[in-house]
A protein has these predicted regions:
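Non-heme Fe(II) oxygenase metal-center motifs and adjacent flexible, charged/small-residue loops
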Residues: 1-155, 164-221
């Protein structure tokens, strides 16, 4: 089902998740990490939360083909051009997943205080049952999923819960060079987050490749 990759399915009710913890070799991942640190126009995205504009707790860059504008939290982002370092990765994903991703959100987590809150990648421009390909570079961080509607998630707001599955919730550790693929009803049934952590951690870059099918549509999250 996934040529040219070692993706293995993860058992989570109603979700379609696959993970290859070593999709890129260490040499490939090291080179890409260094190239993206220097070659991406990192910026602090301003988003709307609780009725006011706030700085996102991370650095980001929206990258894509012409016309792939992206709007979330009532803020519209125009795509930066694809950096040369990402073109081979885009092609490799196309071959592995048979999807021509036309955009990618790059997030840079500088330390354990940088994080991503609970959300689903369910923007209308992604269409029903979107495929999200997430490549992680740099320090390993814990990635959490919980069913939509679940209000509490033990201690993962601090990134301290051990990897594993409990009561329909899941925590994964995403290492350097890993590939996580979310598809099917994953976004409709689950929210995910990258919690902050008090543990000392080095920098991490995450690349979430997407295919926008309704260019310029409004996103809600």
């Amino acid at each position: 089902m996934f040529p040219f990759s070692g993706l293995e399915r993860i058992d989570l009710d109603g979700a379609d998740l696959s993970l290859d913890p070593a999709w890129l070799s260490c040499t490939e991942a090291d080179a890409l990490f260094d190239a993206l640190l220097a070659g991406i126009a990192w910026e602090t995205h301003r988003i709307r939360m609780f009725g006011r504009q706030v700085d996102s707790p991370r650095l980001s860059c929206w990258i894509g083909d012409p016309g792939t504008s992206y709007t979330y939290s009532r803020t519209r982002f125009e795509p930066h051009p694809w950096p040369a370092a990402l073109m081979p990765l885009r092609e490799r994903l196309r071959e592995a997943l048979n999807i021509d991703f036309n955009s990618v959100l790059a997030n840079r987590y500088r330390h354990g205080r940088d994080a991503m809150g609970w959300h689903s990648d369910d923007e209308p421009e992604l269409g029903p049952q979107p495929v999200i390909a997430s490549v992680s570079l740099g320090a390993a961080r814990r990635f959490a999923l919980k069913p939509r509607g679940m209000k509490s998630f033990d201690r993962t707001s601090h990134g301290t819960q051990s990897p594993g599955k409990k009561d329909g919730r899941l925590v994964l550790e995403l290492p350097h060079g890993s590939l996580l693929v979310m598809r099917g009803d994953t976004q409709a049934r689950y929210r995910h987050a990258l919690p902050a952590t008090a543990r000392p951690v080095d920098e991490r870059i995450n690349l979430t490749f997407r295919r926008i099918v309704g260019v310029g549509a409004m996103a809600n999250s």
